[in-house]
Amino acid sequence: VGLTLSGGGAKGLIYVGLLKMIDSLNIKVDYITGTSMGSIVGGLYAIGYKGNELDSLARNTNWSKYLTNNVPLNKITMEEKDEYGKYMIELNSNTLMPGLPIAVINGQNITSFLNDLTFRVHHISDFNKFPIPFKCVAVDIVTGKPVVIDKGSLALALRTSMSIPTAF
């Protein structure tokens, strides 16, 4: 049995219900592929998370914390509060030239979250060696063609698969 899980933002979390059903029926999954949110759900399942664990994770995670880079106002100095989040142009600290940020949201929060979730396999760089072999799909922003990722850091692969160029 092979599973291919597509993207679709939060709609991709519907696969959690499918995985819970697969677990309840004791169906053995032989391999998984996914893109975007489907890669996150599928990748976590491939490394050993069960459907009920993914359900709990989906329900109990403060997704807005991870999908934005908003800093709580109590962490910003009084002097900075008036200016916080006000400008769409950054000053490059190396060249001192103004420019646009690389992305509206740089994704550091979600990257850290994915690193935490995938820590159990941080030492495995070949995704075929996971409990369930896994591949995720991203898009090469230069060519616009799909790229299949099955080696390297799982957290980075998942983050790459869910990226939206210039936005996230």
Task: Give, region by region, the residue ranges found by the protein language model.
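Patatin-like phospholipase
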Residues: 1-35, 43-168
